[in-house]
């Protein structure tokens, strides 16, 4: 019996849309997003039928001579039909999409309400399968927790990470906060909550991301890399595949045909920021510039930037083989930039205020460079053709170098303002560097999973010989294809010293990153499920044990949690340090503690972790609420010792679980199908950044970052503690 061939996650579009075509489908989608689960065509049909019914007794001559005879029945029909749709959508918004009862129940024993909710969900998916953003306006508003609950939960999370004397003082200032300025700030937060769909996201994006004056490289960038197995494509072919597949993804997102996760239950608001757009630096605050789907992408090779069109002059998308020839011709040119001009992209690694000043001076005030900057900032995405062939997974050193290079680049081959910078090394292995401010890691991971599904499982790869033959560029190809256009920047006074300064600064920051990539193949989540514990809870408890062994203490720990079931939401902080987790770690370090006690405490700690996850998913987080209160206090001129204390605490341990977004890749069929995951820089100078994911049922992938300049941390040492923790925790279930 033949295996079922994987399906494309989005349409294979043949042409780049013209202005009229794009206007047409965007207009349709505008109605779709305001009428679902009723489609625009049936909606118009109902209006037409209702209008015709009201006019059945009128003669055609009367209708032709008196327009108001038609307008009144038409207005009644539109009002009546839309009123029904309006009521239906409000029922769905406030009852169906707002229902979170299933999170509180045993999945094996659902309540009647959950059974009814599940049945309604199946009916909706059957009669009106949603497009990418069909349900976005139906998602409930992010709830505002009570002030007392938030402060109480915060104090619970700080009990084990704060010295006793400081904790007593924290309780005192929290009580004063609750009885004075906290109440006033909560009232302003309540007003924000009532008059906006999400009282957090606008503040979060502005003050956590766009107002930050730090360099985007390492501090805001996140990395994604691909499969464990060897790549069967040459570098040129892999670059062409990226250009082709990601152009299709870009156009599908714009058409709202991109297959979303969650079947309409999750916010897709930030997918529109993945392609075409660019973060624009400002002297005090950046902004994100969205652009319509572009016809070109950027390719950088040996420090030289090229505009590569992904369609011909008539808008017909180039095939992979045609793009292969365009990329091959580009790579074999003798027009490469030299000297400091080959490092011009390092300007984007600078602090944001300085980059804003240099952008104005070197680009906007120069007519030629301003034109080229527009080409860059409106491009779909960037693809870096890297010269290194050292990317691999054969050793820890190679895997760690692979992950680090994907995160940082070399200072000349990433335009960090762009949301997506893909990279392909000389041996054909690839990865991507994402800019975090316009979207979250889960959305970028979704994009990368879809790419891998198409690249490795759907498209057929030619033999090595066929690839090399197709890379040959004939005279006929030069006449019929639109070849890459080099971006020839003009030298401006002062540019050389600034480029060299930025490049050296980035090189120093890159060398300070201590990356250790763990590819743990001893077991995966399959083994953990047989133990009856949460896989994420298992890894988080292992992290807590490893950190305690590494530092001799518990610390405030960040884990990103999802609240995307609420409108325009991004992430919330899940705090893994609990009474149960600390009791478990202490038992593990106690030689006198029996194995059955340790096992019991591990299960309780994982259960507490799962319950915290559910609280986050229901909108009952702590940190985003307190963050908004901090912003309001500063804006309104309130002095708050409690909020000052909260905002001054460092995240010495920052973690993130990169979820499997699509389940489109069978990671259990072969070790070569394991997706290696991602990484990010440690948030604190003396802290660790830990990004992990499960490679199906057979692996745990983890990237640990710290800084060589810190005397407190060591990624290699922490990695050893992590592997020991994995084995010691699973050994509790040996019998």
Model-derived regions, located:
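Long, Pro/Ser/Thr-rich low-complexity/intrinsically disordered regulatory tracts in eukaryotic proteins
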Residues: 1-418, 427-428, 435, 439-735
């Amino acid at each position: 019996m033949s295996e079922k061939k994987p399906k494309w996650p989005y349409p294979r579009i043949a042409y780049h849309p013209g202005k009229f075509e794009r206007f047409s489908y965007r207009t349709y989608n505008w109605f779709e997003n305001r009428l679902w689960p009723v489609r625009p065509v049936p909606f118009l049909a109902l209006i037409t039928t209702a209008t015709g019914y009201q006019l059945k007794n009128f003669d055609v001559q009367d209708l032709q001579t008196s327009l108001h005879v038609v307008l009144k029945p038409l207005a009644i029909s539109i009002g009546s039909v839309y009123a029904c749709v309006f009521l239906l959508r409000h029922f769905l918004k406030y009852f169906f999409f707002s229902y979170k009862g299933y999170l509180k129940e045993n999945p094996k024993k659902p309540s009647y309400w959950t059974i009814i909710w599940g049945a309604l969900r199946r009916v909706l998916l059957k009669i009106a399968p949603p497009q990418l953003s069909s349900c976005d306006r139906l998602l409930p508003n992010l709830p505002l927790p009570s002030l007392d609950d938030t402060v109480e939960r915060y104090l619970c999370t700080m009990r084990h990470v704060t010295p006793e004397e400081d904790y007593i003082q924290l309780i005192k200032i929290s009580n004063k906060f609750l009885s004075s300025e906290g109440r006033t700030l909560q009232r302003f937060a309540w007003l924000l909550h009532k008059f906006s769909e999400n009282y957090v996201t606008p503040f979060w994006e502005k003050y956590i991301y766009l107002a930050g004056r730090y360099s985007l490289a390492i501090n805001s960038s996140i990395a994604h890399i691909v499969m464990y197995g060897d790549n069967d494509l040459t570098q040129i072919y892999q670059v062409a595949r990226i250009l082709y597949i990601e152009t299709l993804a870009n156009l599908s997102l714009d058409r709202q045909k991109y297959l979303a996760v969650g079947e309409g239950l999750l916010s897709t608001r930030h997918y529109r920021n993945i392609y075409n757009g660019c973060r624009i630096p400002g002297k005090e605050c950046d902004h994100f510039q969205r652009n319509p789907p572009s016809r070109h992408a950027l390719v950088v090779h040996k420090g030289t930037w090229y505009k590569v069109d992904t369609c011909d002059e008539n808008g017909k998308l180039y095939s992979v083989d045609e793009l292969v020839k365009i990329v091959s011709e580009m790579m074999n040119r003798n027009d490469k930039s030299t000297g400091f001009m080959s490092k011009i992209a390092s300007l984007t690694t600078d602090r944001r205020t300085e980059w804003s000043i240099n952008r104005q001076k070197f680009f906007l005030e120069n007519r030629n460079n301003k034109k080229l900057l527009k080409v860059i900032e409106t491009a779909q995405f960037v693809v870096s053709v890297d010269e290194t062939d050292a990317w691999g997974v054969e050793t820890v050193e190679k895997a760690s170098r692979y992950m680090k290079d994907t995160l940082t680049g070399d200072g000349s081959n990433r335009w960090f303002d762009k949301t997506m910078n893909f990279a392909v090394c000389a041996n054909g292995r690839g990865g991507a560097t994402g800019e975090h401010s316009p979207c979250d890691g889960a959305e970028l991971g979704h994009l990368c999973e879809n790419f891998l599904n198409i690249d490795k499982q759907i498209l057929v790869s030619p033999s090595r010989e066929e690839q090399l033959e197709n890379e040959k560029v004939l005279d006929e190809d030069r006449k019929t294809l639109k070849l890459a256009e080099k971006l020839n920047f003009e030298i401006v006074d002062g540019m050389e010293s600034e480029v060299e300064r930025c490049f050296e600064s980035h090189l120093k920051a890159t060398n300070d990153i201590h990356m250790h990539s763990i590819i743990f193949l001893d077991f995966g989540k399959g083994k953990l499920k047989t133990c009856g514990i949460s896989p994420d809870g298992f890894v988080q408890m292992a992290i807590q044990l490893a950190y305690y062994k590494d530092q001799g203490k518990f610390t405030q720990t960040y884990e990103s949690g999802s609240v995307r079931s609420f409108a325009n939401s991004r992430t919330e902080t899940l705090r893994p340090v609990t009474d149960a987790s600390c009791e478990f770690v202490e038992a593990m370090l106690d030689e006198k503690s029996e194995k059955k006690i340790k096992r019991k405490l591990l299960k309780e700690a994982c259960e507490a972790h799962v319950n915290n996850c559910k609280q986050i998913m229901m909108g009952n987080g702590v940190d985003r609420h307190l963050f908004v209160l901090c912003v309001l206090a500063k804006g309104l001129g309130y002095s708050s010792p409690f909020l000052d204390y909260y905002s001054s605490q460092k995240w010495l341990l920052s973690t993130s679980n990169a979820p499997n977004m699509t389940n489109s890749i069978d990671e259990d069929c072969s070790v070569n199908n394991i997706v290696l995951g991602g990484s990010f820089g440690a948030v604190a100078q003396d802290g660790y950044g830990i990004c992990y994911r499960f490679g199906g049922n057979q692996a745990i992938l983890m990237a640990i970052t710290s800084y060589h300049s810190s005397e407190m941390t060591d990624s290699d040492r922490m990695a050893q503690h992590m592997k020991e923790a994995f084995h010691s925790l699973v050994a509790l279930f040996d019998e």
